[in-house]
């Protein structure tokens, strides 16, 4: 009942009409590989600094002949690199597998780890996988070599429909495994469908998102013929200089749970999806022309399902491609639905991550979602770049909208932080999500030693930090990444890090343990392991078959109070000790801890040598 009351209280701050908690989905983990950002933390650094990751097309993406499209874009590094052995794939098969499939495998593992879920523990469970994708560039590259160059791995390796299936197969999970193609809205539609799967009980846990890799130069040329790309490599969302979009690539996944399940499991949601909607505009316009009425409708439906009023939105992450045709339509729809519902003194803030990364195609929507999740976490709104003067076709003041032009504090005096995320496919499939910050985590009462319960609120004086990898290089890399995290996050709670490493990470054959009593000592010793060295407080090696040793210490090694510190600091030890006392004799606790009235019980043979 306490959990349900907490959810009702939190929901009451969002709307007056407090309804059942059905419909809220927690984002408990994220992973991404975007231009200039190999993960959510790196993405936030890019956004907070107001930087972009647009570059000239790398040499390997230019093709044998000079392409006609502008050379700019957002690109990933080393898309050809893949740890095939880690995922149980032979080198021969890996060469035939689309890098989009390979990237989703990596992102799936990282997203589960970010959620504190050991992948082995979901085997056989109802974990659903929903992945948006529409690019087939690798298949086209393979087809150039002709059928005689194909192997038995080529067909499944290049089938886009297998992107989600391969992750489900690797994890050995039995929930739905679905590929989504609704054009540029694919990844956000995948998240929408994933939420439905959770709400119907079809899945208990879901990994959802999208992927896009632009490996074929001709694909960009064809896109330029359809709707011109920005000639100067900048996305001018809502700006008077809007002249086309910038192609980008990447992948992003989120791990979703029903909110009540996430809170009951002790998860810390990064944000909450309050509601979502998907629609199409029919044939009222040309196939690839955006439909304002359809966009208005998808906004209203999402707000209705989230059970919020439009006035409660504080920010909207735009589709925002920077095209002369698309931006005015999106702005007009937002103004009609949201801007008109807000006080004129508080225009709606809007922005687009496409100004930082380019248009990530099938992964564009999930990029916006992860941006908003990070903004909620930091309680700051990053700037939407390249905005100086409003597009003359967009009357921002009349629409009651404002472009977020700098990194600003995001606070709400009258309730949770609430944002919208939009993503529209070129064929007319529109999707909108309503996102909120999560309810505060419940705090369990502190357990006191005198009552037979551990005090989990105090960290032990020395902490073990457990690391592992499939090989020595991977182990060193883990140590380096952990060290980087501790350097970048001076506020990180070390006992939480130690716990997560010990309890919420898969354990591999190459292992190391670093023992440290503080931040500086931890940094020093992680540096040693990262460099492949050894030293005080660092133990590393390769795991072998375990062996059992039974130690009989004899009489005389006991002392009064022995184990009290362990009992006070570690709830698991306390629970086991209490269980032993119940099975043997409750007086054991008094004897070991030297409690008042216990006298010299510990010197008695009955207790000293049972």
Model segments located where?
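A non-catalytic, amphipathic alpha-helix used as a structural packing/dimerization or gating element
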Residues: 103, 107, 477, 481, ...
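Short, solvent-exposed alpha-helical surface patches in well-structured domains
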Residues: 42, 333, 476-477, 524, ...
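A generic structural signal for nonpolar/aromatic side chains embedded in well-ordered alpha-helices
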Residues: 46-47, 76, 223, 238, ...
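Short coil/turn segments at secondary-structure boundaries
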Residues: 57-63, 88-89, 121-123, 494-499, ...
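Flexible catalytic loop/linker elements that gate and position reactive groups at enzyme active sites
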Residues: 30-33, 52, 290-305, 315, ...
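FabD-like malonyl-/acyl-CoA
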Residues: 469, 536-610
